[in-house]
Regions:
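Phosphate/pyrophosphate-binding loop motifs in nucleotide- or prenyl diphosphate-using proteins
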Residues: 1-175
């Protein structure tokens, strides 16, 4: 089969979907990440107004991250500073709760946050591949994506702590 771009615009889900460059893969992936974050917001239990407010602030920044490779940069030092502050806030509140590698388990919102966490790691990998292929972008992007993965993890720990959900250690047989 010869895979061709349709002439009918209704049959094209994204203007760049037929590109062979990784840029489109990055954009489709970060679009998925933004959707996953929307799912987290839809599933957040009562009593987490602080987390909801932070996730609502963060939500459009995922689309800023999305458009920052093809378009102009939308992730700035101020965004990194804000995310560092929020990471430190939740990390301090849940200090000492996780000291080992834990299995990703918990209520739906926590599991959706774990999906965001792993999606952020994929974002870092795609940025790395884009960089290797010669695509230029601001160094704030991989820093933000790495921090994002860690932030999502800290939120899972904080939420499970407040809900009194046990963390289950993962005991590796590999290392």
């Amino acid at each position: 089969m010869s895979f061709r771009k349709p002439k009918n615009r209704k049959e094209i889900c994204y203007p760049f979907i037929y590109e062979s460059a990784l840029t489109c893969d990055y954009e489709v992936h970060t679009d998925e990440l933004c959707s996953l974050l929307g799912m987290v917001l839809a599933q957040m239990p009562e009593g987490f107004d602080d987390v909801v407010a932070d996730l609502e602030t963060l939500h459009p920044k995922i689309y800023h991250l999305n458009g920052s490779v093809r378009g102009k940069n939308g992730i700035f030092e101020e965004d990194l500073e804000w995310l560092h502050e929020r990471y430190d806030h939740y990390n301090k509140l849940s200090a000492g709760r996780v000291t080992r590698f834990v299995l990703p388990r918990g209520p739906v919102a926590v599991m959706a946050l774990h999906q965001c966490r792993t999606g952020s790691k994929k974002t870092v990998r795609l940025l790395h591949r884009l960089d290797e292929s010669g695509v230029k972008f601001e160094e704030t992007l991989p820093r933000f994506a790495n921090l994002l993965a860690n932030f999502f993890f800290v939120l899972t720990v904080y939420i499970k702590m407040k809900l009194d959900v046990e963390e289950i250690d993962y005991i590796s047989i590999n290392y």
